[in-house]
Amino acid sequence: MSNKTTRVVILSEVELRKTLSRLTSEIIEKVKNLEKLLLVGIPTRGIDLAEVLEQELFSKTGLKIRKGIIDPTFYRDDQNRVGTRLIKATDIPTPIEEQEILLIDDVIYTWRTIRAAMDALYSWGRPRRIMLLAMVDRGHRELPIQPDFCGKKVPTSKNESIYLRLNNIDNEEGVFLEKL
């Protein structure tokens, strides 16, 4: 028996660009004071996605939006089950008190990473508001958390994975589902 992987395109490069443009417009519409906005990427692709969104926001508004990184690894309640990976340095460029935080992750699955990221953020202070952006919501919630901004909802089975690929890192762009 072989481990053959099937890859399905969920968002092509063109569709991904349109989705990023839509998400950027939604952020501009929902966040009343963009100068108080802090984009916070969650490793690994959430960091890269935050950079893309920062560029998109700048091209639409002319504002340089601040961005940071939060690594929630040490705040996870499921480390024994999922294991640990190489830790990425947390970098929050400004005090978060009274800031509008936009947590950014590429694919959301059980929501445990998001809960851990929120716990990690609160160790830095109390923001005015925390919002969540995910490129893909797979379902399978274990916690009652919803994204404020979502690129696409893709119900999956547990033997499937979804990957965001970006040109500057992967030499291809899109969102892909892989079945094992």
Give a label for each model feature.
Residues 1-180:
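PRPP-associated nucleotide enzymes
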